[in-house]
Amino acid sequence: MGAYAPAAGVSARGCLDAAGPWTISRALRPPLPPLCFFLLLLLAAPCARAGGYETCPTVQPNILNVHLVPHTHDDVGWLKTVDQYFYGIKNDIQHAGVQYILDSVISALLADPTRRFIYVEIAFFSRWWHQQTNAMREVVRDLVRQGRLEFANGGWVMNDEAATHYGAIVDQMTLGLRFLEDTFGSDGRPRVAWHIDPFGHSREQASLFAQMGFDGFFFGRLDYQDKRVRMQKLEMEQVWRASASLKPPTADLFTGVLPNGYNPPMNLCWDVLCVDQPVVEDPRSPEYNAKELVDYFLNVATAQGRHYRTNHIVMTMGSDFQYENANMWFKNLDKLIRLVNAQQAKGSSVHVLYSTPACYLWELNKANLTWSVKHDDFFPYADGPHQFWTGYFSSRPALKRYERLSYNFLQVCNQLEALVGLAANVGPYGSGDSAPLNKAMAVLQHHDAVSGTSRQHVADDYARQLAAGWVSCEVLLSNALARLRGFKDHLTFCRQLNISICPLSQTAARFQVIVYNPLGRKVNWMVRLPVSEGVFVVKDPNGRTVPSDVVIYPSSDSQAHPPELLFSASLPALGFSTYSVAQVPRWKPQARAPQPIPRRSWSPALTIENEHIRATFDPDTGLLMEIMNMNQRLLLPVRQTFFWYNASIGDNESDQASGAYIFRPNQQKPLPVSRWAQIRLVKTPLVQEVHQNFSAWCSQVVRLYPGRRHLELEWSVGPIPVGDTWGKEVISRFDTPLETKGRFYTDSNGREILERRRDYRPTWKLNQTEPVAGNYYPVNTRIYITDGKMQLTVLTDRSQGGSSLRDGSLELMVHRRLLKDDERGVSEPLMENGSGAWVRGRHLVLLDTAQAAAAGHRLLAEQEVLAPQVVLAPGGGAAYNLGAPPRTQFSGLRRELPPSVHLLTLASWGPEMLLLRLEHQFAVGEDSGRNLSAPVTLNLRDLFSTFTITRLQETTLVANQLREAASRLKWTTNTGPTPHQTPYQLDPANITLEPMEIRTFLASVQWKEVDG
């Protein structure tokens, strides 16, 4: 988005040529034979990396070198859809056509061998590449080989850092970098991460970049106060130590702040979209301005150089969708470079050159300085005193949930494709493919997609892409399940279970429920299906009857809630169980509809409880009043209810309004949606629920299942009323007496936990001008408060903004509807199709000791992100996979993974090749009671049941370099020398994972015959 505050070896090529042109493939499937792919990785040794830097231009010693970086920033959707941007459609909205930019840039690079250009968004570049002739592809390969066309970052998109989950970040980066590796070999491998537009930067993002093999990271947006301090202290560039668990330098990443965001210096923009004056060097012309521009440039360069530590500085020469007429840019830059460098003969100490981020980084590394170290992150981001970009943490909550559900579904799709092999892609249901959903999910990670900061029609298009990806994966799942089950049924994927709609379960007297568990450990999962009224019998995979309930729910004013069938499914690791459901001919409700509980001051307190938890509700208000952990004998008063902030439309202090990006409430104290809730109670052997109705547009169900150690709070909000002309930003708030000393804790992209302190920044003295918005942080999976003894943790089902604005309090923003744009470029208020959106979601609440809490929230968050997938079938289908007995239960693992180990990725990579990632999901010292923070060792040789691993190669996180061949630039820090890394060894029978470590493997496999 463009609103920025002013302020190859021959052998490798042979493999590529043998494979033919790169084609769109399924599930990261390469066009290269495995042997060629491994050869490419082996050729990518440290010498190849040095060779990449050796293509950098010559610099001048002892004077200021100004590295001009021509670039374009091409949003993968924002004001226009992805296709509209690529083809240049709807230029009345925004003049932008990516295909013309790339055409023009290649032509301009060929005109002068000194010119350089960087490109970032592989979602666009790959599409352009597929439209080129073989001759043009060779031209581009030559430019890449020469280092004149350089890829920075290399992900499918430039992902957001606040609303993204680390698994989806890794997937989208893998997709983009895989394309570059397949297409250009090591020549096209980016050496620098480049996040010039995301609105704040997470520590986990930097850790992931380091583990991907990047040498450095440059970004554009930095809090205005932080930037001022850094410029004064000469800390615009430093080393980011991005993990408290991984041993340095594993997660160390050299990080630089760009001086002008990602724009050119003022008055030096020579794009067709700009109005700055071109360089006129003919002194006879009345428009002659060369001397003035040269003097101006020298002053700008000298001033910038005062804030950086070496005799090298960088200037970004480009911006949003620029270089559609690249000649206009390059012609003026050619003149500027020649004229400025000519001044050296007159004593100037400034040298200007075409460069790239990697070449600039190379010079910084050669300076051999000692750099300061950063340990925290760059949230929240503000570009002015009342302009905190913390609203987008919660914008478009329905899209955020759809993205998270799609990540869940994609992993199920990838796993079954890997477990079954080609039979999942071509089978009785047709051609199944994981690639469309993989690419759609990659697009959704863009910093104007999952962030909720695009225009409405673009958000609709993002959802369309996800839906199309689901269809293709559903075919794949159907083929895989037919192969594994031995049945060909008409499978039904009930996509609207969140609103209790599933036609098959609501109409059929008999049906089957297949529940697939994507986790590497057994799970007990409560299945909830809408049904007709009656009595149902549920049988497990062995034909034994299991307890079940039909719960009849109260009807709200707006819609009827169908009865729901509940039963607990026992699911094997990385596998499925099949349950059969039959309606009993006689009608007898298993639970009567709950009646409203009147509010009387003398009424006893209402409780729901199981063997682990008791939740107590105030009889006068209907609000949650108290939670008790009965195992630990912990009792905590907890008052939970909903409030809303009145969104600012500007005031006397500032005309800044709340919008898609900005959160700015009119006052610090939010208003209650209601001071009490009408409540209804549901109690059956399988579930206890308190239904709370706060208003016509806000309700909640507090739910407790047998055996569970957490409360489930299922909230429903919307459409938010704005008839009073007040925009509203709705929060769920938990108030407790815990003495938290201004501290609370949030996750970073779903992985490590960061401490937050109210009205505080770790690296500068904060002038807090927005006490609410300035204390909001992104919450991807969890937030908690603790007094050191007790800990209250709330897990989310999507990314949200959250905070603790007073001791003992915790809040999460669940929905927003705004009447005014925040003037950051969208030019559209966040109204969600005008009528507003109704959104449903879940918060999972845990109360435990501070010492034991991590074991609970880590494993629960894993299960929330990768929840079981429910598929229905009418039953009685034809036999499939003749020769093998029918199967009602299956596990893809021969043994469960330990609880501290998460199977992050199992996906098809190529013919007889799989991509495997294993992760230690606990941090150092996080759990001592069960020793879950200790290193853990696995044997991969016979771990999987459907295939045998014949060869195992360990790679970097994104699988574009062999780990043994990968090397990164080394940096000296003021914290002293980093430990010497132990020599690399790989033994498939002894794979050890250290806390927070992710290990990535390419496995050559042979699939086994699927039998009983």
Swiss-Prot record:
Coiled coil regions, renumbered to chain: none
Catalytic activity: Hydrolysis of terminal, non-reducing alpha-D-mannose residues in alpha-D-mannosides
Covalent S-S links between cysteines: 56-359, 269-274, 413-473, 494-502
Gene Ontology cellular component annotations, sorted alphabetically: lysosome
Gene3D superfamilies per record: 2.60.40.1360, Glycoside hydrolase 38, N terminal domain, Glycoside hydrolase family 38, central domain, Golgi alpha-mannosidase II, Golgi alpha-mannosidase II, domain 4
EC number: 3.2.1.24
EC class of the enzyme, as a word: hydrolase
Subcellular location per the Swiss-Prot or TrEMBL entry: Lysosome
Primary site of residence: other
UniProt-recorded Gene Ontology molecular function terms: alpha-mannosidase activity; carbohydrate binding; metal ion binding
The organism's place on the tree of life at top rank: Eukaryota
SMART domains assigned to the protein according to its UniProt record, in alphabetical order: Alpha-mann_mid
Signal peptide range: 1-50
Cofactor: Zn(2+)
Keywords: Disulfide bond, Glycoprotein, Glycosidase, Hydrolase, Lysosome, Metal-binding, Signal, Zinc
Cofactor detail note: Binds 1 zinc ion per subunit.
UniProt cross-references to InterPro entries, sorted A to Z: Gal_mutarotase_sf_dom (IPR011013), GH38_C (IPR041147), Glyco_hydro/deAcase_b/a-brl (IPR011330), Glyco_hydro_38_C (IPR011682), Glyco_hydro_38_cen (IPR015341), Glyco_hydro_38_cen_sf (IPR037094), Glyco_hydro_38_N (IPR000602), Glyco_hydro_38_N_sf (IPR027291)
Glycosylation site list: 368, 498, 646, 652, 693, 767, 833, 931, 990
Active site, UniProt feature: 197 (nucleophile)
Binding, Zn(2+): 73, 75, 197, 447
GO biological process terms held by the UniProt record: mannose metabolic process
Similarity annotation: Belongs to the glycosyl hydrolase 38 family.
Function (record text): Necessary for the catabolism of N-linked carbohydrates released during glycoprotein turnover.
Name of the protein this chain belongs to: Lysosomal alpha-mannosidase
Biological source species: Macaca fascicularis (Crab-eating macaque)
Gene name, Swiss-Prot/TrEMBL: MAN2B1
